[in-house]
């Protein structure tokens, strides 16, 4: 089983977008991005999506042909992003639609993906912001 913790934000909303993520398996950290900057004009939700996409893309590449059998648990504090990728909520903002499609496309390449909300304090504890 693989676990992803992701978080993103924006200084200004929209403003300077940034994000981070951690990918673990069996308690071992496989990949950790502490701060990836996404440039100006980025909203909080776009930054959240970009962090999730970065983590899913990294894990997909890391696993290669084995991705289709992998179980992945994704944890984040963005209810909007998590509910949209689960299909529980519609994507009403056209600016988020490309990010949503990319995240779903990546998630569909794994055997099983569960999207779980956690409190912001868990993101801070794991990712440092």
Q: Model features per residue range: what roles?
A:
Residues 21-23, 27-28, 47, 66, ...:
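General N-terminal targeting signals
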Residues 48, 52:
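Short, conserved alpha-helix that lines the donor NDP-sugar binding/gating region
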Residues 9-13, 53-129:
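RNase H catalytic domain
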